[in-house]
Structure formats: C-alpha cells, structure tokens
C-alpha cells in the first residue's frame, strides 16, 4: 500500500483553471464537483452536458480535451458511466494524459508517475463522495518527474 499526504486544496495551488464535462451518466457528479470547486474559488469551464438526457460522450469530451491539449486549462475532469469512454476520446489528443481513477492509490499514481492532466471518473462505480476525494487527490498530487518524465515524454511521441 502506498501512503500519501493529502495537501490542502486552495487557490494558493498553481492550479486555477479547470475544465469539466460529462455525459448523461456523469451529469449529477459533474454538478456536485463543479459546486465544490467553485466554493474553493477555482475557475471552472463546463463543457456539458446540461441534463441527464442521453447524449454521445464524445460530444463534450472532444472540445474539453482539445482545450487541455492547447494548455487553455490546468487540468480537466471528465465523467461517464465507466470512465473508459471519455478517457478513450480524451487520449486521442497528443498532450492529453487522461486516467480512469476509481480509488485513491490509482489516482495518486496517475499524477505521480503518469502526470495525468485529465481525471476520468466512473460514475456508475463510485459514490459522489469518492469522486470528490479522488479529485482532491488528483489536484493536489505532484508529478514526481525523474525516471517518470522520460516515460511520459515518450507518450506524446508520434508513431
């Protein structure tokens, strides 16, 4: 088991601009997380969806991932039923490293070892409280660099 120290999530952190989006399955979680982040004075841009009416998950994820890829945002949050669909779409973009996070250790390692810049949450498999906990870990865990930097740089290389 890896242990970690949860840092305080404040505006003193270098993160300020967060992109968030979901499909219908993740809508309630998106709204819950958005409300929390706004209460912490983060600047949030919501890429949709705006209801629980069924939509195709690539529709909100493509513009969100493109914006993270262009470094318009510090981090991104995407949510669908499994987390997989939204992560697959986001990872089409060269500088995006979207990680499906379903527990604290996976979330921490996604940041420490993979420098994930988008968290993908599986709304059908975690509670809203777990989603918030994972998001706090995601936003406060630093990338370790070192040997991991070399590996992360290889991710964005064109094949």
Give the role of each language-model region:
Residues 63-100:
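Helix-adjacent hinge/juxtasegments
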Residues 1-10:
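Short, Lys/Arg-enriched N-terminal segments with co-localized hydrophobic residues
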Residues 20-38:
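Glycine-rich phosphate/diphosphate-binding loop of Rossmann-like nucleotide-binding domains
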Residues 15, 72-74, 115:
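Short, high-confidence coil segments that cap the C-terminus of an alpha-helix
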Residues 53-62:
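Structural motif
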Residues 21, 104-159:
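C-terminal binding/interaction regions
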């Amino acid at each position: 088991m890896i242990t970690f120290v949860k840092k305080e999530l404040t505006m003193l952190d270098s993160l300020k601009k967060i992109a968030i989006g979901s499909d219908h399955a993740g809508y309630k979680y998106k709204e819950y997380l958005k409300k929390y982040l706004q209460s912490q004075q983060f600047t949030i841009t919501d890429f949709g969806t705006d209801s629980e009416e069924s939509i195709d998950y690539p529709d909100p994820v493509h513009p969100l991932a493109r914006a993270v890829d262009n470094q318009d945002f510090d981090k991104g949050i995407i949510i669908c039923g499994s987390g997989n669909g939204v992560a697959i779409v986001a990872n089409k973009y060269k500088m995006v490293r979207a990680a499906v996070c379903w527990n604290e250790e996976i979330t921490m390692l996604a940041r420490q070892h993979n420098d994930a810049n988008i968290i993908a949450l599986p709304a059908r498999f975690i509670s809203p409280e777990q989603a918030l906990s994972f998001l706090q870990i995601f936003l406060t865990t630093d990338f370790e660099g070192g040997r991991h930097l070399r590996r992360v740089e290889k991710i964005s290389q064109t094949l």
